Amino acid sequence: MTITGIIAEFNPFHNGHKYLLDQAEGLKIVAMSGNFMQRGEPAIVDKWTRAQMALENGADLVVELPFLVSVQAADFFGQGAVDILDRLGIDSLVFGTEEVRDYQKIADLYTEKGAEMEKFVENLPDSLSYPQKTQAMWKEFAGLDFSGNTPNHVLALAYAKAVAGRNIKLHPIQRQGAGYHSVNKDVDFASATALRQHQKDQDFLERFMPSVALFEQASKVIWEDYFPLLRYQILSNPDLTTIYQVNQEMAVRIKEAIKTAQSVEELVELVTTKRYTKARVRRLLSYILVQARESNLPEAIHVLGFTEKGRQHLKSLKGQVSLVSRIGKEPWDAMTQKADQIYQLGKPSIAEQNFGRVPIRIETN
């Protein structure tokens, strides 16, 4: 049987995600971000709610990406997620993209010329942002031209790099309906961005979200809920360079900007430069919020939920892969667990995220 991997955030889960799961074949394993997103923001609803949405709509097994995989630039995000899915035995990776290209050919190119390509990136001027450097590399070696307005395509290229040299086939699915950042309401498939913006519009949610009741019952948060906490972390920390990935230049800019910024968005605007994109600045602010430090990724994989089919697959992996299904006295990943505790501070109604929680079981799918 085919074992298909899907890398996702489901922030929140919508019809486009259901379409992606419907297109996938065989046993469907989702590696999903926890409570903080790749572009440096808290998830609108918590990881357990999003895992349940996925399991109710076609996923067989949902595992969690650790914080230091979730909140990363595309390449590291893709690499970390593919590593986890590879250990769970996937033979194909399905993903949505705005531009369906021959990603398999791109992966083969990277297998062959990866070292040369990375050297090319290293020699590019530091005045370029990381995404600009990556784009220059793909243009040089694969003749690819694209704008930064196609985040799924950028991630797809990161997945192509990550599967290079592994026995995993790539299956791109053309993105349906609205673009990634679109807030348009007159489409067949709405984007996650639009759903976050129109979260109080009942009719809109019912049109575009398959598990709408779960979403409505869950506590919802936005970055602004954490602004007082973020401000406190910035003001009380004498040396921000002790935080993961914060350099001297960024530390100075952030310390200066917090004196006048009245919101997270304003802070991001003030700190962003040509070289440091908004997404990168948001990631740095997420690291500061949770006091992230460089740490090793966990050996074990945290299981958030499964169907009967997913349970059988986990059984077949026993002894080969280290799995965690209940976080108790023994931590799974201290960094992720700390981030989750801080996530809970966003709303008093958010349930405990780790201690004593067991995987969600869905009998049929």
Swiss-Prot record:
**Reaction it catalyzes:** cytidine(34) in elongator tRNA(Met) + acetate + ATP = N(4)-acetylcytidine(34) in elongator tRNA(Met) + AMP + diphosphate
Keywords of this protein's UniProt record, alphabetized?
Answer: ATP-binding, Cytoplasm, Ligase, Nucleotide-binding, RNA-binding, tRNA processing, tRNA-binding
- Enzyme Commission number: 6.3.4.-
* Presence of keyword ATP-binding: yes
Q: Name one GO biological process term.
A: tRNA modification
Positions with a binding annotation for ATP: 7-20, 96, 152, 175
Quote the subcellular location field of this record.
Answer: Cytoplasm
SUPFAM superfamilies tied to this protein? Nucleotidylyl transferase
Which top EC class applies here? ligase
Entry GO terms, CC: cytoplasm
Q: Does the keyword Translocase apply?
A: no
Q: What is this protein called?
A: tRNA(Met) cytidine acetate ligase
Per the record, the similarity remark reads: Belongs to the TmcAL family.
From the UniProt record, which GO molecular function terms apply?
ATP binding; ligase activity, forming carbon-nitrogen bonds; tRNA binding
A Pfam family for this UniProt protein? HIGH_NTase1
As recorded in Swiss-Prot or TrEMBL, the protein's gene is named tmcAL
Regions crossing the membrane: none
